[in-house]
Amino acid sequence: MGKSQSKLSQDQLQDLVRSTRFDKKELQQWYKGFFKDCPSGHLNKSEFQKIYKQFFPFGDPSAFAEYVFNVFDADKNGYIDFKEFICALSVTSRGELNDKLIWAFQLYDLDNNGLISYDEMLRIVDAIYKMVGSMVKLPEDEDTPEKRVNKIFNMMDKNKDGQLTLEEFCEGSKRDPTIVSALSLYDGLV
């Protein structure tokens, strides 16, 4: 993507129509908004964290925003360009449940080894708890990140090896109504 393009080329537009769940008009609107907010055509980690802070003013979303940024930044160059942004937005807002679960798995799999360790899950859940702050009243069996992660691993880690495969994560998530509802949070919003 060029730095100061005001419109997507026809080739770029066709490519994005094929790889997202947005139509041409929506893509052009998102593109315009992206460049209005990011005139350089790139969003860096600190800018991304500032955006999250606006949505979670009563907590500290910086760690969680960093984890999300790392999944959005598909080519790992330290910036999110429009294509990376719109592809991730497409999955999180309009994707099928399985697509969302794969995306969420990538979020939790911090070292990208194809497994989610207890520690990786704990780091993400801890970041989520810090982000929501005191806004959410949690049940007693989930009122600390450790309790929540223990509950998740007890439910999902079928072979009890201390790590979750993609299959274990997807199957377990589908059985947990709180995970399914969290993954459906943005449905229909964009």
From Swiss-Prot:
InterPro entries: EF-hand-dom_pair, EF_Hand_1_Ca_BS, EF_hand_dom, Recoverin
Binding residue positions for Ca(2+) 1: D73, D75, N77, Y79, E84
Keywords annotated in UniProt: Calcium, Lipoprotein, Membrane, Metal-binding, Myristate, Repeat, Sporulation
PANTHER family, A to Z: CALCIUM BINDING PROTEINS, NEUROCALCIN HOMOLOG
GO BP of this protein: calcium-mediated signaling; negative regulation of calcium ion import across plasma membrane; phosphatidylinositol phosphate biosynthetic process; regulation of signal transduction; sporulation resulting in formation of a cellular spore
Gene that this sequence comes from: ncs1
Note: Binds 3 calcium ions via the second, third and fourth EF-hand.
Membrane topology of this protein: Peripheral membrane protein
Effect after changing E120Q: Growth defect at high levels of extracellular calcium
This protein's name: Calcium-binding protein NCS-1
Domain EF-hand: from-to ranges: 40-58, 60-95, 96-131, 144-179
Entry similarity comment: Belongs to the recoverin family.
Subcellular location: Membrane
Entry's Gene Ontology cellular component terms: cytoplasm; cytosol; intracellular membrane-bounded organelle; membrane; nucleus; plasma membrane; trans-Golgi network membrane
Chain positions recorded as Ca(2+) 2 binding sites: D109, D111, N113, E120
Function: Negatively regulates sporulation perhaps by controlling Ca(2+)-dependent desensitization of git3.
Organism: Schizosaccharomyces pombe (strain 972 / ATCC 24843) (Fission yeast)
Positions bound to Ca(2+) 3: D157, N159, D161, Q163, E168
